């Protein structure tokens, strides 16, 4: 009990709560030398409460990063200034300037962004030659981070220049699977990549680590119908859902995972499955909005959790409870029915 109270107190200290525009501006001024992560949240939104917990964990892992939560509706002047239209929204600041943004409850993406900004701002002092060598290695890793990498201004969800927006639209139109890097989030990468690839402008598209070009080149490739042969295609959602539902003999789509259910219904179904002794795998729908929405249509089942056996939907919690009470659950899980 005492240990739990101590952990809660530690998390409370690690995440600062801001209640006024003046306090926020003062914090921006004081935290110029460190990364500042601000969560615009609302107490009535359960996903915000969940992301506060995620942020508290990140605060323990990154003691040199300043984590702040700000109730969006309580400080409207700050929310309006930064165009906060929904919660949760996260803003990232360095040197009092906004360098990145994340909209929505995406815990893995928040963790990735924090780690990226921390690593980008913590190069040890060394000679110019060593710094250049380290940067080139980093750029090589970044350009190879995915089969198709787009270096752009902003994110695919929120492009911050017309050329980047057009590039994203072309890639989406051709169903091309790509990852992106926001050059506004890292000035060193932004300047270094120009020299590394001898290409002075953004956006820049890479396939297998090789520069394809900027927007004009991509438009030319689209016009000549070569783009589809160069860039990797994203699997269609229906195909992806078929693969996911057949990933294991017994698949549970839930909020959270085996170790940590993030809703009461998911927790109950885990307890039932664990009591059967049957092996199963899980998929956290909170980490993938496309799967979360797509599976509802794919299986014509509007709620979660959803249990599948050999790719076929068994049902949600109520169905699983009925099957257990009737003694039918175990044979179904074992594929005997």
UniProtKB/Swiss-Prot annotation:
GO cellular component: cell cortex; cytosol; dendrite; iron-sulfur cluster assembly complex; nucleus; Z disc
Binding residue positions for [2Fe-2S] cluster: 161, 263
Entry-linked PANTHER family: GLUTAREDOXIN FAMILY MEMBER (PTHR10293), GLUTAREDOXIN-3 (PTHR10293:SF73)
Induction description: In neonatal cardiomyocytes after exposure to the hypertrophic agonists EDN1 (ET-1) or phenylephrine (PE). In transverse aortic constriction (TAC) induced cardiac hypertrophy in adult hearts.
Alphabetized UniProt keyword annotations: Acetylation, Cytoplasm, Iron, Iron-sulfur, Metal-binding, Phosphoprotein, Repeat
The protein's name: Glutaredoxin-3
Domain Thioredoxin: start-end pairs: 2-119
UniProt-annotated location(s): Cytoplasm, Cytosol; Cytoplasm, Cell cortex; Cytoplasm, Myofibril, Sarcomere, Z line
GO MF, any single term: identical protein binding
Domain named Glutaredoxin: residues: 144-238, 239-337
Domain comment in the entry: The thioredoxin domain lacks the two redox-active cysteines. This strongly suggests that it lacks thioredoxin activity.
PTM sites of type N-acetylalanine: 2
Organism encoding this protein: Rattus norvegicus
Function: Together with BOLA2, acts as a cytosolic iron-sulfur (Fe-S) cluster assembly factor that facilitates [2Fe-2S] cluster insertion into a subset of cytosolic proteins. Acts as a critical negative regulator of cardiac hypertrophy and a positive inotropic regulator. Required for hemoglobin maturation. Does not possess any thyoredoxin activity since it lacks the conserved motif that is essential for catalytic activity.
Subunit-structure text: Homodimer; the homodimer is independent of 2Fe-2S clusters. Heterotrimer; forms a heterotrimeric complex composed by two BOLA2 molecules and one GLRX3 molecule; linked by [2Fe-2S] clusters. Interacts (via N-terminus) with PRKCQ/PKC-theta. Interacts (via C-terminus) with CSRP3. Interacts with CSRP2.
InterPro entries xrefs: Glutaredoxin (IPR002109), GRX_PICOT-like (IPR033658), Monothiol_GRX-rel (IPR004480), Thioredoxin-like_sf (IPR036249), Thioredoxin_domain (IPR013766)
Main location: cytoplasm
GO terms under biological process: [2Fe-2S] cluster assembly; cell redox homeostasis; intracellular iron ion homeostasis; iron-sulfur cluster assembly; negative regulation of cardiac muscle hypertrophy; regulation of the force of heart contraction
Alphabetical list of Pfam families matching this protein: Glutaredoxin, Thioredoxin
